[in-house]
């Protein structure tokens, strides 16, 4: 009998109940008992949803009040000193303090732990902080309490733990430098204690997640796996080692031979590893095949997956398990909530509940191939695949022909930067250290209300347009009064930097309830790319043209780049990411050319997610970087030399991609640098980056307003690394989340600092 199981389920709830409860608790509108009751109800519902879908072995421990890595930190006693309670054990207040920071109270004020991306997903985890003298102590009873809950409800459960090597890898050494592997022998006894307690609760199987096995691991970490699991094997319970987000590659032999009872592999991301693992797996081990995509929204091709399963079943028999490729945390919860999608498009989709049903039907197809439910599901799957293959909504010959006709010349500016910049400086006539902002201004309650009223039909097109024009007039007047050199229209009409454009492109669709957790209470609802992408009409031109008509100063057009549009959407699975990126690039190229034709002389194309697209394996980086830089140039290279192309990137590591950033050939790049004290510019100096740079002179993520002298000092440091004539002056990022008073105060100081530097260098 093939067994159906799940590696994890979304925790937020079908209607984001967890988010609402968290935020009510933080505001003091819900007490701890109320919050815990919401969590208990969600877990009960989610276990029932999975069981009713046909999952045999339910995950427990995938629920988290904020983040699963943070939950493990509390369980292991990895609580930074600034958050430790003065008396008694850690509490929910401790957990939320670690996640969000503490402004007062028991800790006397403490900044939150660092947050970063969970592998190459759009989920973020709280980075554990380790000291050289780190001690681990079992605390935080959540896992054991939830096992008890599930068993009391009659469920067969499989607790989920992050493995010891992955947990250490994800953390950061704080204070004195030391090797994190030195902590392994101190951490391993806790796993033994956990397994013993779970065994006493009647648990048979435990899932140990070690996704770092799909990374390029140093040899000492590979050696540590053998040492750790040789120790762990002595403890009770059957152990399923789970890997996902990629292929095991050179770690395949290591993973196959670790002394555990089963191995899970991701056959969505790395189907090529299947034949080898089948040959290398010891005869006593269970093999769990991740055949249903856990991080996208499209229905599985059941016949294709079943062919692999049937082959595996011939070799493995009872040792075959079926699962999603990874935790369903990265998928929306339940497609049945979607009541406004048309029937055809909805038939192509599967959210977490439906993915569990697909896993269950695949297992049943192995066990009972002639069962009526199996035959019906396979017939429906064939119909879905045929519908998608032939649908004119998906396949647009004109778009495909345009992509096929792209030439190398299309992604090259007409002249080299040195020639372009001379023409741009002559035409723009900007001072040394020109000042600008990154694009967005504060999104006030009145802006959000106007947008909502328009969507609900309460405002006419004319009324909404006038409301947005009023906001644009205000933004332009403020910038002129403050003395900024290059203005923006403020983006009042934009709800989100991806959604705004996706709503206007053919090939995108939106859901009502397709929410996924980004971190904590922050949920996002990514757009879905379902077909070939094109731009039926101009998207920003009228807003920017209106803004330019209000001022004699240079107005900057603002667009989101193709890579960011792709990375922050659910992509298609039937064509490659680079093909989708090229389609997006052509649509954006048309917009850039329309802006230029409307008299806009600077166009900014934001690529906030450029670095996020990097594959997990270094060997695959260059291919990605080649097409990612090419599609940026494709959307930017149709303009005349006199038109200046800007891009903005907001992350803190450039050294390993600096050549590719240069290859994008943007005339100006604006970046986050204020928190690094301009040290990030060392990468640009060492590489001799040739184009212009706007290093952010203040951190927009903080309400603090730095004074002009502080910003001037940062500019002096920047001028030591980059020639002054190539420096721009701007904030770190957009100002959407800030209030107007602090925005104006900070920009006054920024303009003052720029003027001070001009005097010094005159």
Curated annotation (Swiss-Prot):
Pathway linked to the protein: Amino-acid biosynthesis; L-methionine biosynthesis via de novo pathway; L-methionine from L-homocysteine (MetE route): step 1/1
Active site: 701 (proton donor)
Cofactor(s) it depends on: Zn(2+)
Entry EC no(s): 2.1.1.14
Catalyses which reaction(s): 5-methyltetrahydropteroyltri-L-glutamate + L-homocysteine = tetrahydropteroyltri-L-glutamate + L-methionine
Keywords from the named record: Amino-acid biosynthesis, Metal-binding, Methionine biosynthesis, Methyltransferase, Repeat, Transferase, Zinc
Enzyme kind, highest EC tier: transferase
UniProt-listed CDD domains: CIMS_C_terminal_like, CIMS_N_terminal_like
GO MF entries: 5-methyltetrahydropteroyltriglutamate-homocysteine S-methyltransferase activity; zinc ion binding
Entry keyword annotation includes Amino-acid biosynthesis: yes
Keyword Metal-binding among UniProt keywords: yes
SUPFAM superfamilies found in the cross-reference section: UROD/MetE-like (SSF51726)
Residue pairs linked by disulfide bridges in the UniProt entry: none
Binding locations of L-methionine: 438-440, 491, 606
Residues involved in 5-methyltetrahydropteroyltri-L-glutamate binding: 16-19, 117, 522-523, 568, 612
Pfam families to which the protein is assigned, alphabetical: Meth_synt_1 (PF08267), Meth_synt_2 (PF01717)
GO biological process: methionine biosynthetic process; methylation
Residues annotated to bind Zn(2+): 648, 650, 672, 733
Binding-site positions, L-homocysteine: 438-440, 491, 606
HAMAP family: Meth_synth
Similarity comment: Belongs to the vitamin-B12 independent methionine synthase family.
Protein purpose: Catalyzes the transfer of a methyl group from 5-methyltetrahydrofolate to homocysteine resulting in methionine formation.
Name of this chain's protein: 5-methyltetrahydropteroyltriglutamate--homocysteine methyltransferase
The organism of origin for this protein: Pseudomonas fluorescens (strain ATCC BAA-477 / NRRL B-23932 / Pf-5)
Source organism phylogeny: Bacteria, Pseudomonadati, Pseudomonadota, Gammaproteobacteria, Pseudomonadales
Gene: metE
């Amino acid at each position: 009998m093939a067994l159906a199981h799940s590696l994890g389920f979304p925790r937020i709830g079908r209607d984001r109940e967890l988010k609402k409860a968290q935020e009510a608790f933080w505001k003091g509108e819900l007490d701890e008992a109320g919050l815990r009751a919401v969590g208990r109800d969600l877990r009960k519902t989610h276990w029932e949803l999975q069981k009713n879908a046909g999952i045999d072995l339910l995950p427990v421990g995938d629920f988290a009040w904020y983040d699963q890595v943070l939950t493990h930190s509390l369980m292991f006693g990895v609580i930074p000193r600034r958050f430790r309670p003065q008396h008694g054990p850690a509490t929910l207040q401790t957990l939320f303090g670690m996640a969000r920071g503490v402004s007062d109270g028991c800790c006397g004020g403490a900044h939150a732990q660092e947050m970063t991306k969970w592998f190459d997903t759009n989920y973020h985890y709280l980075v554990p902080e380790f000291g050289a003298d780190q001690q681990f102590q079992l605390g935080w009873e959540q896992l054991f309490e939830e096992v008890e809950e599930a068993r009391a409800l009659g469920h067969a459960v499989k607790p989920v733990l992050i493995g010891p090597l992955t947990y250490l890898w994800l953390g950061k050494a704080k204070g004195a430098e030391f090797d994190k592997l030195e902590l392994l022998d101190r951490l391993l006894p806790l796993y033994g204690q956990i397994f013993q307690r779970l065994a006493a609760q009647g648990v048979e199987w435990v899932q140990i997640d070690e996704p770092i096995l799909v990374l390029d691991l140093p040899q000492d970490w590979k050696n540590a796996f053998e040492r750790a699991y040789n120790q762990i094997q002595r403890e009770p319970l059957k152990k399923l080692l789970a890997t996902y987000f990629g292929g095991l590659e050179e770690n395949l032999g290591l993973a196959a031979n670790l002394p555990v009872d089963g191995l899970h592999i991701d056959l969505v991301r790395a189907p090529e590893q299947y034949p080898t693992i089948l040959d290398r797996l010891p005869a006593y081990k269970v093999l769990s095949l991740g055949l249903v995509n856990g991080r996208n929204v499209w229905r599985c091709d059941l016949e294709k997956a079943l062919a692999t399963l049937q082959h595996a079943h011939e070799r493995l028999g009872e040792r075959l398990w079926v699962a999603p490729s990874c935790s369903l945390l990265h998928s929306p919860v339940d497609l049945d909530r979607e009541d406004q999608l048309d029937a055809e498009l909805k038939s192509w989709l599967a959210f977490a509940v439906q993915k569990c049903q697909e896993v269950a039907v695949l297992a049943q197809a192995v066990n009972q191939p002639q069962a009526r439910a199996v035959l019906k599901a396979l017939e429906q799957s064939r119909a879905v695949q045929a519908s998608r293959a032939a649908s004119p909504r998906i396949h647009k010959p004109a778009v495909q022909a345009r992509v096929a006709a792209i030439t190398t010349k299309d992604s090259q500016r007409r002249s080299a930067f040195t020639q372009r910049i001379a023409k741009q400086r002559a035409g723009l006539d900007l001072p040394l250290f020109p000042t600008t902002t990154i694009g967005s201004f504060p999104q006030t309650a009145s802006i959000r209300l106007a947008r909502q009223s328009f969507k609900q039909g309460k405002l006419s097109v004319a009324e909404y347009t006038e409301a947005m024009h009023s906001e644009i007039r205000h933004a332009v007047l403020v910038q002129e009064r403050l003395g900024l050199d290059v203005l923006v229209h403020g983006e009042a009409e934009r709800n989100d930097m991806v959604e705004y454009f996706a709503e206007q492109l053919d090939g995108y669709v939106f859901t009502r309830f397709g929410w996924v957790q980004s971190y904590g209470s922050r949920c996002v609802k990514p757009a879905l790319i379902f077909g070939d992408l094109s731009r039926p009409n101009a998207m920003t031109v009228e807003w920017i043209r209106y803004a330019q008509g209000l001022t004699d100063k240079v107005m900057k057009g603002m667009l989101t780049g193709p890579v960011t549009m792709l990375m922050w959407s659910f992509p298609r699975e039937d064509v490659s990411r680079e093909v989708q990126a090229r389609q997006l690039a052509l649509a954006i190229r048309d917009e850039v050319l329309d802006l230029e034709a409307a008299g806009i002389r600077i166009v900014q194309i934001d690529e906030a997610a450029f670095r996020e697209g990097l594959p997990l394996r270094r060997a695959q980086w260059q291919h990605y970087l080649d097409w990612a830089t090419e599609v940026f140039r494709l959307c930017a290279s149709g303009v005349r030399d006199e038109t200046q192309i800007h891009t903005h990137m907001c992350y803190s590591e450039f050294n390993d991609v600096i050549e590719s950033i240069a290859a994008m050939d943007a005339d100006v790049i604006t970046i986050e640098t204020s928190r690094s004290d301009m040290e990030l510019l060392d990468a640009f100096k060492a590489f001799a980056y040739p184009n212009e740079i706007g290093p952010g002179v203040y951190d927009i993520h903080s309400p603090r307003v730095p004074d002009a002298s502080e910003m001037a000092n940062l500019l002096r440091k920047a001028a030591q690394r980059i020639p002054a004539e190539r420096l721009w002056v701007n904030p770190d990022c957009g100002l959407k989340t800030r209030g107007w008073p602090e925005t104006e105060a900070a920009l006054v100081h920024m303009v003052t600092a720029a003027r001070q530097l001009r005097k010094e260098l005159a």
